[in-house]
């Protein structure tokens, strides 16, 4: 089990006004990130993957050591299929990932709610994705008004998601 130091994103913003911290904003079309995992507060160093309706790279990455890391997935906000379900999420727990943020959908909602993993996604859908081995790892991502770069730090709770180039907590 990975341990995250308790924090509140609001307080991190208030306490670090001298740092360049980005705040993920809800989109004008009403898309909001929702928490699906049992872990409601999570943080870590960002690992990025860009994929559209193909979770091959997500599955591969979450089967590697994720200690102190959060996978950020740009799924193009697709509402047609899920990029993570219970089996991939169980792998993430097994390999000590702190969390996963998906700009797209997940599935197996009830099973995910039981896992000690931070999970934020736009929505749930029962349809699984195609696996064709397509996706880019380690690329800069941009959604919700935030640029996600591999190696930066992400902090998520029920208030929202923030990103910083510097580590804000130990």
Swiss-Prot record:
**Named cofactor requirement(s):** a divalent metal cation
What EC number(s) would the UniProt record show? 4.1.3.17, 4.1.1.112
Which residues take part in binding a divalent metal cation? 108
Q: Does the keyword Lyase apply?
A: yes
InterPro entries referenced in this protein's UniProt entry, alphabetically? RraA (IPR010203), RraA/RraA-like (IPR005493), RraA/RraA-like_sf (IPR036704)
Which residues are involved in binding substrate?
85-88, 107
Q: Give the note describing cofactor binding and stoichiometry.
A: Divalent metal cation.
- Extract the CDD domains matched here: RraA_family
Molecular function (Gene Ontology), one example: ribonuclease inhibitor activity
Q: Does the keyword Glycoprotein apply?
A: no
Q: Which GO terms describe its biological process?
A: regulation of RNA metabolic process
Catalysis performed (reactions): 4-hydroxy-4-methyl-2-oxoglutarate = 2 pyruvate; oxaloacetate + H(+) = pyruvate + CO2
Q: Report keywords, A-Z.
A: Lyase, Metal-binding
Q: What does this protein do?
A: Catalyzes the aldol cleavage of 4-hydroxy-4-methyl-2-oxoglutarate (HMG) into 2 molecules of pyruvate. Also contains a secondary oxaloacetate (OAA) decarboxylase activity due to the common pyruvate enolate transition state formed following C-C bond cleavage in the retro-aldol and decarboxylation reactions.
Q: How does it assemble?
A: Homotrimer.
- Alphabetized NCBIfam families for the sequence: NOT-MenG (TIGR01935), PRK09372.1 (NF006875), PRK12487.1 (NF009134)
Give the family from UniProt: Belongs to the class II aldolase/RraA-like family.
Name listed for the protein in its UniProt record: Putative 4-hydroxy-4-methyl-2-oxoglutarate aldolase
Q: Which organism is it from?
A: Acinetobacter baylyi (strain ATCC 33305 / BD413 / ADP1)
């Amino acid at each position: 089990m990975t341990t995250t130091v308790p924090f509140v994103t609001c307080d991190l913003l208030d306490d670090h006004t001298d740092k360049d911290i980005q705040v993920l904003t809800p989109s004008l079309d009403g898309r909001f990130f929702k928490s699906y995992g049992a872990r409601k507060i999570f943080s870590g160093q960002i690992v990025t993957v860009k994929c559209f309706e193909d979770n091959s790279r997500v599955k591969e990455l979450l089967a590697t050591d994720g200690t102190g890391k959060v996978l950020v997935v740009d799924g193009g906000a697709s509402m047609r299929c899920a990029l993570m379900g219970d089996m991939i999420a169980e792998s993430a727990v097994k390999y000590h990932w702190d969390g996963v943020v998906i700009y797209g959908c997940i599935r197996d909602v009830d099973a995910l709610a039981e896992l000690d993993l931070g999970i934020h996604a736009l929505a749930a859908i029962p349809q699984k994705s195609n696996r064709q081995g397509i996706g880019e790892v380690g690329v800069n991502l941009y959604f919700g008004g935030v640029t996600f770069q591999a190696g930066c730090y992400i902090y998520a709770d029920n208030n929202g998601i923030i990103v910083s180039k510097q580590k804000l907590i130990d």
